[in-house]
Protein backbone atom coordinates (compact mmCIF):
# COMPACT_ATOMS: atom_id res chain seq x y z
CA UNK A 1 0.00 0.00 0.00
CA UNK A 2 1.38 3.38 -0.94
CA UNK A 3 2.15 5.82 1.81
CA UNK A 4 0.24 9.05 2.25
CA UNK A 5 3.38 10.95 1.24
CA UNK A 6 3.46 9.20 -2.13
CA UNK A 7 -0.15 10.08 -2.72
CA UNK A 8 0.32 13.74 -1.90
CA UNK A 9 3.40 14.02 -4.10
CA UNK A 10 1.37 12.65 -6.98
CA UNK A 11 -1.28 15.27 -6.34
CA UNK A 12 1.26 18.06 -6.81
CA UNK A 13 1.28 17.40 -10.55
CA UNK A 14 -2.45 16.98 -11.01
CA UNK A 15 -4.54 19.93 -12.19
CA UNK A 16 -7.56 18.50 -10.42
CA UNK A 17 -5.75 17.47 -7.28
CA UNK A 18 -8.65 18.06 -4.95
CA UNK A 19 -11.52 17.31 -7.31
CA UNK A 20 -13.55 14.21 -6.60
CA UNK A 21 -13.27 12.99 -10.19
CA UNK A 22 -9.52 12.63 -9.74
CA UNK A 23 -9.06 9.07 -8.48
CA UNK A 24 -6.42 9.12 -5.75
CA UNK A 25 -5.18 5.99 -4.05
CA UNK A 26 -6.73 5.26 -0.66
CA UNK A 27 -4.47 4.48 2.30
CA UNK A 28 -4.79 3.84 6.00
CA UNK A 29 -1.16 4.78 6.60
CA UNK A 30 0.06 8.06 8.04
CA UNK A 31 -1.99 10.43 10.15
CA UNK A 32 -3.69 13.80 10.35
CA UNK A 33 -3.81 16.64 12.82
CA UNK A 34 -6.67 19.08 13.23
CA UNK A 35 -6.62 22.48 14.88
CA UNK A 36 -10.15 23.31 15.97
CA UNK A 37 -10.85 27.04 15.94
CA UNK A 38 -13.50 29.71 16.19
CA UNK A 39 -12.90 32.20 13.38
CA UNK A 40 -14.15 35.75 13.83
CA UNK A 41 -14.06 36.12 10.05
CA UNK A 42 -13.83 32.70 8.35
CA UNK A 43 -13.23 34.18 4.90
CA UNK A 44 -10.35 36.32 6.16
CA UNK A 45 -8.85 33.35 7.99
CA UNK A 46 -9.08 31.14 4.90
CA UNK A 47 -7.45 33.85 2.79
CA UNK A 48 -4.64 34.06 5.34
CA UNK A 49 -4.13 30.28 5.27
CA UNK A 50 -3.83 30.46 1.49
CA UNK A 51 -1.37 33.36 1.49
CA UNK A 52 0.83 32.45 4.47
CA UNK A 53 2.15 28.88 4.52
CA UNK A 54 4.75 29.48 7.24
CA UNK A 55 2.90 27.39 9.81
CA UNK A 56 2.49 24.48 7.40
CA UNK A 57 6.17 24.55 6.48
CA UNK A 58 7.15 24.68 10.14
CA UNK A 59 5.21 21.52 11.01
CA UNK A 60 6.49 19.52 8.04
CA UNK A 61 3.03 18.58 6.79
CA UNK A 62 2.78 17.15 3.27
CA UNK A 63 -0.65 18.66 2.66
CA UNK A 64 -3.02 20.92 4.56
CA UNK A 65 -6.36 22.64 4.29
CA UNK A 66 -9.48 23.62 6.18
CA UNK A 67 -13.03 22.51 6.90
CA UNK A 68 -15.67 25.17 7.55
CA UNK A 69 -18.88 24.08 9.28
CA UNK A 70 -21.95 24.89 7.22
CA UNK A 71 -24.70 23.26 9.32
CA UNK A 72 -24.85 21.86 12.84
CA UNK A 73 -22.65 24.59 14.35
CA UNK A 74 -21.59 24.42 17.98
CA UNK A 75 -20.72 28.10 17.66
CA UNK A 76 -20.38 30.80 15.02
CA UNK A 77 -17.22 30.57 12.92
CA UNK A 78 -16.69 26.89 13.68
CA UNK A 79 -13.95 25.35 11.53
CA UNK A 80 -10.69 23.46 11.69
CA UNK A 81 -7.35 23.37 9.91
CA UNK A 82 -6.21 19.88 8.91
CA UNK A 83 -2.69 18.69 8.13
CA UNK A 84 -1.67 15.35 6.58
CA UNK A 85 1.50 13.47 7.51
CA UNK A 86 3.15 10.36 6.10
CA UNK A 87 3.45 8.82 9.57
CA UNK A 88 2.05 9.21 13.06
CA UNK A 89 5.61 9.91 14.15
CA UNK A 90 5.68 13.00 11.94
CA UNK A 91 2.17 14.01 12.99
CA UNK A 92 2.99 13.91 16.68
CA UNK A 93 6.39 15.56 16.19
CA UNK A 94 4.69 18.50 14.47
CA UNK A 95 3.31 19.71 17.80
CA UNK A 96 6.86 20.35 19.00
CA UNK A 97 7.86 22.15 15.80
CA UNK A 98 5.05 24.70 15.82
CA UNK A 99 2.83 25.60 18.77
CA UNK A 100 -0.37 27.29 17.54
CA UNK A 101 -1.20 28.25 21.12
CA UNK A 102 1.86 30.48 21.04
CA UNK A 103 1.76 31.51 17.40
CA UNK A 104 4.40 34.05 16.38
CA UNK A 105 2.08 35.17 13.58
CA UNK A 106 -0.12 37.97 14.88
CA UNK A 107 -2.24 37.74 11.73
CA UNK A 108 -3.54 34.30 12.64
CA UNK A 109 -4.21 35.25 16.25
CA UNK A 110 -6.20 38.30 15.20
CA UNK A 111 -8.80 36.35 13.22
CA UNK A 112 -9.29 33.10 15.16
CA UNK A 113 -9.56 31.64 18.64
CA UNK A 114 -8.00 28.21 19.18
CA UNK A 115 -10.19 25.59 20.83
CA UNK A 116 -7.92 22.53 20.82
CA UNK A 117 -5.68 20.35 18.67
CA UNK A 118 -5.79 16.58 18.09
CA UNK A 119 -4.08 13.86 16.05
CA UNK A 120 -6.03 11.28 14.02
CA UNK A 121 -5.26 7.79 12.76
CA UNK A 122 -7.25 6.53 9.74
CA UNK A 123 -8.73 3.11 10.55
CA UNK A 124 -9.75 2.31 6.97
CA UNK A 125 -8.29 3.20 3.55
CA UNK A 126 -9.07 6.87 2.91
CA UNK A 127 -8.84 9.02 -0.21
CA UNK A 128 -7.70 12.58 0.40
CA UNK A 129 -10.10 14.54 -1.81
CA UNK A 130 -11.69 17.42 0.12
CA UNK A 131 -15.14 18.63 -0.86
CA UNK A 132 -18.56 18.85 0.77
CA UNK A 133 -18.38 16.60 3.81
CA UNK A 134 -20.43 15.17 6.63
CA UNK A 135 -18.55 14.65 9.89
CA UNK A 136 -20.20 12.49 12.53
CA UNK A 137 -18.52 12.10 15.93
CA UNK A 138 -19.49 8.77 17.46
CA UNK A 139 -18.75 6.59 20.47
CA UNK A 140 -18.21 2.92 19.61
CA UNK A 141 -17.22 0.35 22.26
CA UNK A 142 -13.68 -0.90 21.82
CA UNK A 143 -15.01 -4.45 21.45
CA UNK A 144 -17.12 -3.38 18.45
CA UNK A 145 -14.67 -1.09 16.66
CA UNK A 146 -13.26 -3.77 14.36
CA UNK A 147 -16.78 -4.72 13.23
CA UNK A 148 -17.70 -1.04 12.86
CA UNK A 149 -14.74 -0.37 10.57
CA UNK A 150 -15.36 -3.59 8.61
CA UNK A 151 -18.93 -2.51 7.87
CA UNK A 152 -17.78 0.96 6.85
CA UNK A 153 -15.28 -0.60 4.42
CA UNK A 154 -18.13 -2.62 2.91
CA UNK A 155 -20.30 0.50 2.74
CA UNK A 156 -17.50 2.24 0.83
CA UNK A 157 -17.26 -0.68 -1.61
CA UNK A 158 -21.02 -0.54 -2.11
CA UNK A 159 -20.91 3.15 -2.99
CA UNK A 160 -18.13 2.60 -5.52
CA UNK A 161 -19.84 -0.45 -7.04
CA UNK A 162 -23.01 1.61 -7.51
CA UNK A 163 -21.03 4.32 -9.29
CA UNK A 164 -21.07 6.97 -6.56
CA UNK A 165 -17.95 9.10 -6.15
CA UNK A 166 -18.35 9.44 -2.42
CA UNK A 167 -15.44 8.68 -0.09
CA UNK A 168 -15.82 7.43 3.48
CA UNK A 169 -13.35 7.58 6.33
CA UNK A 170 -13.10 6.50 9.97
CA UNK A 171 -10.52 8.12 12.24
CA UNK A 172 -9.46 7.42 15.82
CA UNK A 173 -8.32 10.30 18.02
CA UNK A 174 -4.93 10.43 19.71
CA UNK A 175 -4.37 13.04 22.42
CA UNK A 176 -7.75 14.67 21.94
CA UNK A 177 -8.29 15.74 25.53
CA UNK A 178 -11.72 15.48 27.12
CA UNK A 179 -13.48 16.56 23.92
CA UNK A 180 -12.26 13.81 21.58
CA UNK A 181 -11.35 11.05 24.06
CA UNK A 182 -12.93 7.74 22.99
CA UNK A 183 -14.37 9.41 19.87
CA UNK A 184 -14.31 8.17 16.29
CA UNK A 185 -14.72 10.64 13.44
CA UNK A 186 -16.76 9.30 10.54
CA UNK A 187 -16.51 11.28 7.31
CA UNK A 188 -18.52 11.03 4.10
CA UNK A 189 -17.24 13.21 1.26
CA UNK A 190 -18.72 14.28 -2.07
CA UNK A 191 -17.55 16.91 -4.51
CA UNK A 192 -20.47 19.33 -4.05
CA UNK A 193 -23.56 19.75 -1.85
CA UNK A 194 -25.75 18.65 -4.76
CA UNK A 195 -23.68 15.51 -5.30
CA UNK A 196 -23.95 14.70 -1.62
CA UNK A 197 -27.69 15.29 -1.67
CA UNK A 198 -28.20 12.94 -4.61
CA UNK A 199 -26.52 10.12 -2.69
CA UNK A 200 -28.80 10.79 0.28
CA UNK A 201 -31.88 10.89 -1.97
CA UNK A 202 -31.05 7.43 -3.31
CA UNK A 203 -30.16 6.11 0.15
CA UNK A 204 -33.45 7.18 1.73
CA UNK A 205 -35.57 6.08 -1.23
CA UNK A 206 -33.93 2.66 -1.27
CA UNK A 207 -33.97 2.82 -5.07
CA UNK A 208 -30.32 1.81 -5.50
CA UNK A 209 -28.23 -0.95 -3.92
CA UNK A 210 -25.39 1.19 -2.62
CA UNK A 211 -24.06 -0.51 0.49
CA UNK A 212 -26.51 1.28 2.74
CA UNK A 213 -27.16 -1.86 4.78
CA UNK A 214 -23.52 -1.86 5.85
CA UNK A 215 -23.71 1.79 6.91
CA UNK A 216 -26.75 0.94 9.02
CA UNK A 217 -25.02 -2.15 10.44
CA UNK A 218 -22.05 -0.01 11.44
CA UNK A 219 -24.20 2.59 13.16
CA UNK A 220 -26.12 -0.13 14.99
CA UNK A 221 -22.88 -0.60 16.94
CA UNK A 222 -22.71 3.07 17.96
CA UNK A 223 -23.39 3.80 21.62
CA UNK A 224 -23.83 7.53 21.07
CA UNK A 225 -23.66 10.15 18.34
CA UNK A 226 -21.91 13.13 19.90
CA UNK A 227 -22.34 15.55 16.99
CA UNK A 228 -23.16 15.74 13.30
CA UNK A 229 -21.96 18.48 10.92
CA UNK A 230 -21.93 19.37 7.25
CA UNK A 231 -18.69 21.04 6.23
CA UNK A 232 -17.09 22.70 3.25
CA UNK A 233 -13.47 21.54 2.97
CA UNK A 234 -10.54 22.38 0.70
CA UNK A 235 -6.81 21.82 0.38
CA UNK A 236 -4.71 25.00 0.44
CA UNK A 237 -1.16 23.69 0.81
CA UNK A 238 1.03 20.97 -0.72
CA UNK A 239 4.66 20.50 0.32
CA UNK A 240 7.27 21.20 -2.34
Q: Where do the protein language model's features map onto the residues?
A:
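Short S/T/G/P-rich N-terminal loop/turn motif that feeds into the first structured element of a domain
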Residues: 19-240
Amino acid sequence: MKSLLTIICALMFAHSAIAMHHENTATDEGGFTTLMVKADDPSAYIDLLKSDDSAFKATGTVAAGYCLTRTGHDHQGQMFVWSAFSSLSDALASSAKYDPMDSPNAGFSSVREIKYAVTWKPLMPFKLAPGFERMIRVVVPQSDREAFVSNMVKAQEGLYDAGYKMNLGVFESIGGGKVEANILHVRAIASTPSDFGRVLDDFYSGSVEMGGKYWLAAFALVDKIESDYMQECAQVYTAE
